[in-house]
Amino acid sequence: MAVLKNVQFSKLIKAEGRLREFNFRKSNGIAGPVYHVDVSDDRGNRYYINLHLEDNTWTVQEKNLPPWIQEAVVQFHPAIQEQEV
């Protein structure tokens, strides 16, 4: 029986000129591993993002994200790699 490690962490990532706390949680689904990421904006609205592993790179599935989140997405893959080592 395989043991699946629960991965959950927070990372401060600079977006829109300030540090924001992005919360990452990994789940293992039928189609492979998925990271669920959430972050809140200045008004307290929470955004939920799903990342899937494609060609050894974590890619965002959601469209129409605010520009400051799209700007931060490039930092997600290194943050995940750092935790999984």
Name every feature range the model reports, one short phrase each:
Residues 14-18, 40-42, 63:
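Short strand-coil-strand connectors
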